[in-house]
Amino acid sequence: MEHLTLGPLTRATGTVRLPGSKSISNRVLLLAALANGETRVRDLLDSDDTRVMLQALRTLGVAWRQDGPDYIVTGAGGNFPVKSAELFMGNAGTAIRPLTAALALQGGSYKLSGVPRMHERPIGDLVDGLRQVGAVIDYLGNEGFPPLHIQPASLRIDAPIRVRGDVSSQFLTALLMSLPLAQSASGRIEIEVVGELISKPYIEITLNLLARFGIEVERQGWERFILPAGTAYRSPGEIFVEGDASSASYFLAAGAIGGGPVRVEGVGMASIQGDVRFADALNRMGANVMAGDNWIEVRGTERDDGRLHGIELDCNHIPDAAMTLAVAALFAEGTTTLTNIASWRVKETDRIAAMATELRKLGAVVEEGADYLRVTPPQPWQTPADGIGTYDDHRMAMCFSLAAFGPLPVRINDPGCVAKTFPDYFSVFAGVTR
């Protein structure tokens, strides 16, 4: 197996220009494809997940081209030209879930599949929501999971659509992004969220981007969303993709652990991404944080020993970036407890179990529950002979690069898995650490 040995590292300082946000990139691509008009997308993330979406759109007959670093998407006006297709979605949840909803409105026959892990990631709540309005969707494997077969159907929306919000916010995002194209006798469509809605900041990203494409959604708390029916999406002409706030977390944590200053550019106080609030968590752990509209900078703690201190944090607002805190906890005095992270279990891997397993290899004392993780730093540090497993999960690999600030080298297995969102992560990380 390919591996990469890092550290021990003692210092982090420098500036990083972030790659585009995965969450924003794939939303923008689909909205641009559904819109009327041509959209120039600037700073689109170049990664496995965006390539999956781009290839799917091309298969569906959507025209796009590159113009230097930009992508120009010619919208299909809500109607994909190709009415029968088989689409391979890799392990891109941000692609398969919104596309499932969009394709259910197309009146065509589509099969969607992915890698084996994708076939273990739930999609049943979204399918249930679409079936409520007449969509015909069959499971080709296990009930509630991809692969799927979407068949021609005429959707009828005459009552509120109910969807669970406690497994993944992507189900709600998928409905919000597609249902404005549907018809309703009342001229509006209501979505009711059943249960506690997790990862609310990702819904805020969706609502913000819908507004950029001319769709205004009325939000009544986090329980009810009212959309205009039979609406055409309008291209904004040009749209910029923010830097990825989840990817920013690794460099900001490096600044906190390795002294800093480390500055990330591409996200800041003006960001629409909830994960920028990761910097607040570092501040609570004792790091020094500064920020502008489009940048964040972190330095280490003022303590003589340079150590952070453990915290207890409800992570519902930063579900992806919270993973970085679990590794940063190795360098904190006391115990760090991360709660409200049940969504980790249905991501690229079961991230609670994976994180607990790999932290224990380094000597940490870890307690895991259904929706929490409690981490106490190693006494003493250990270095696993078999390295750190990454589970084909980009965020596991990037998180554990921070373990190289410990007193022993750390071996990262399958470092190439970062290609999902940040192909050159390790070279960028090397540029700000020593």
From Swiss-Prot:
Keywords: Amino-acid biosynthesis, Aromatic amino acid biosynthesis, Cytoplasm, Transferase
Highest taxon of source: Bacteria
Reaction catalysed by this enzyme: 3-phosphoshikimate + phosphoenolpyruvate = 5-O-(1-carboxyvinyl)-3-phosphoshikimate + phosphate
Transmembrane regions: none
GO terms of biological process kind: amino acid biosynthetic process; aromatic amino acid family biosynthetic process; chorismate biosynthetic process
Single annotated GO MF: 3-phosphoshikimate 1-carboxyvinyltransferase activity
Positions annotated as active site in the UniProt record: D320
Keyword set includes Transferase: yes
Record-listed 3-phosphoshikimate binding positions: K22, S23, R27, S168, S169, Q170, S199, D320, K347
GO annotation, cellular component aspect: cytoplasm
Pathway(s) per entry: Metabolic intermediate biosynthesis; chorismate biosynthesis; chorismate from D-erythrose 4-phosphate and phosphoenolpyruvate: step 6/7
Compartments, record wording: Cytoplasm
UniProt-listed PROSITE patterns: EPSP_SYNTHASE_1, EPSP_SYNTHASE_2
EC annotation from Swiss-Prot or TrEMBL: 2.5.1.19
Sites where the protein binds phosphoenolpyruvate: K22, G93, R121, Q170, R351, R395, K420
Location, primary (coarse class): cytoplasm
Protein role: Catalyzes the transfer of the enolpyruvyl moiety of phosphoenolpyruvate (PEP) to the 5-hydroxyl of shikimate-3-phosphate (S3P) to produce enolpyruvyl shikimate-3-phosphate and inorganic phosphate.
Family the UniProt entry places it in: Belongs to the EPSP synthase family.
HAMAP family cross-referenced by the UniProt entry: EPSP_synth
Quaternary structure note: Monomer.
Protein name per its UniProtKB record: 3-phosphoshikimate 1-carboxyvinyltransferase
Organism expressing this protein natively: Cupriavidus taiwanensis (strain DSM 17343 / BCRC 17206 / CCUG 44338 / CIP 107171 / LMG 19424 / R1)
